[in-house]
Amino acid sequence: MRIARDTRRRSVKAGLPAALLVLLLAVFAVGCGGSDDSATGSGTDSSGGGKLDVVGYSTPEAVYTEALEPAFEESSKGSGVSFSNSFGASGDQSRAVAAGQPASIVHFSQAGDMERLVEEGEIVAKDWDQNQYKGIAQNSVVVFVVRKGNPEGLESFDDLQSKDVEIITPNPFSSGSARWNIMAVYGNAIEAGKSPDQALDEVRTVLEKTVAQPGSGRDALSAFTQGQGDVLLSYENEAIKAEEEGEDVEYVVPPATLQIETPIAVTKDAPEPAAQDFLDFIWSDEGQEIWAENGYRPVNPKLVDEKQFPTPKDLFHIADFGGWGKVNDEFFDDETGSVAEIEKELGVSTSG
């Protein structure tokens, strides 16, 4: 049974007496002539642990709102803590926080979006990644989501080169997940012994076959399940979610693929200790088990079930290409990036 479903049930059961308590307190306040302090969001009482603004990339929204947050609220350190949530394309979310959107916890799909907040006013501390998990909340891998039965017979990234298929992947200038996808294509070629120029040619071929580039990973999944394309490049967890929700799809883990690492941090103005307590909960065994039961690979190696999450034969990492700082400059810089140049030639927006 999925932990997310268990947590939702616990949350509902716990919420009934809480609702009665709120009602009784409201009646008491009116009876005593107290004033009504209206506010947006869920808020907390004066003795509570504060309100946390979670800003994240699109795909883990349900894990937060239906599992992680309710479970934390039921813990001793989460008592009195409430949440406000904002989820969307990773790059858009990062830019919004840099522009002033309130955020206590930020969770993006790639480290470049986190580094933006370090560089612009140190909204996030420079040492955000200096812990045993290097600031990573959970892992995944790049997979193919295909129609039931895999009618095109897609097994590896090489098949995307040789077969006449319509591909869906998000726009890499708004979506972090798309950058993982593109680097998986590139990395597969490099791992096979091809030159950087040859690898970039394979990226070009994939983008030429791409029939839709939605703004986020979640939007890309929606486009695919609504009938567009033959194959979707996606996070493994999104593929698992689609299968569990009864979509007429299945997924393939290529033998050579890229590990996805999603960074998380507290912001400098986050209410403490609530923000750090929630971050610690996300890294706790309970938090990591919630991620695992929702299709994400735990960062704690002791909690990884090899039957559920078998290690691909050739698993490579973004660090193999110099890390996101180098990768973003070389491939995704709007003015000089090689992928940006390809996208512009194809008439795709690179403005983010």
Residue ranges and their predicted role:
Residues 126-137, 157-158, 243-258, 266-267:
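Short beta-strand->loop
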Residues 124, 149-155, 174, 187-195, ...:
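Short helix-loop capping/hinge motifs at secondary-structure junctions, enriched
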Residues 192-255, 263:
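Ligand-binding pocket segment of bilobal, Venus flytrap-like solute-binding proteins
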Residues 247-289:
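Extracytoplasmic/periplasmic substrate-recognition and gating elements
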Residues 27-31:
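C-terminal motif of bacterial Sec signal peptides marking the signal peptidase cleavage site
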Residues 70-77, 158-218:
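Ligand-binding cleft/hinge of the Venus flytrap
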Residues 37, 41-174, 314-317:
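N-terminal segment of the mature folded domain
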Residues 6, 34, 273-352:
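Extracellular/periplasmic juxtamembrane helices and adjacent flexible linkers that interface
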